[in-house]
Amino acid sequence: MCGIVGALSLPGASLKMTESYITTMRDTMIHRGPDGGDTWIAEDATIGLGHRRLSIIDLSDAASQPMATADERYWLTYNGEIYNHQEIRAELIALGYSSWKTNHSDTEVILYAFAEWGIECVHKFRGMFAFALWDATLRELWLVRDRIGVKPLYYSTHHQRLVFAS
């Protein structure tokens, strides 16, 4: 089971996101992802994402998170498993998505599914999941979990920040 964390500075907040803030959040869940961890902080330091990794589907470093689309518009930290990710990937390839950095990462499928279909992509997913997806162009954060809530996702506001974790 992976661990995801993040924080978004609320409008008017004077606090900027720091790597140490996200890293501290992330590493409190080291038991949820012993295979590695990473963080991403936006250039303007208004949002940060973190991930503790338990490698299951794609064991390569290319599948590390947080992960971004090639144009870095979308950023994702994700925990779970999309059982039908190969079918969705084939559909995306048929639509012209031909540049993949991983061979079979369901994380990358979520990113490009969101790029193609927006939030409606979740209706295609069969599995258990929780994720945070940042749209850097629209400056929107999506916090999403599976229909039943198998993968937890908690959030709160704290010191002018929306904070969240699995």
Regions found by a protein language model. Give the residues of each.
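Cysteine-centered catalytic environments shared across enzyme families
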Residues: 1-166
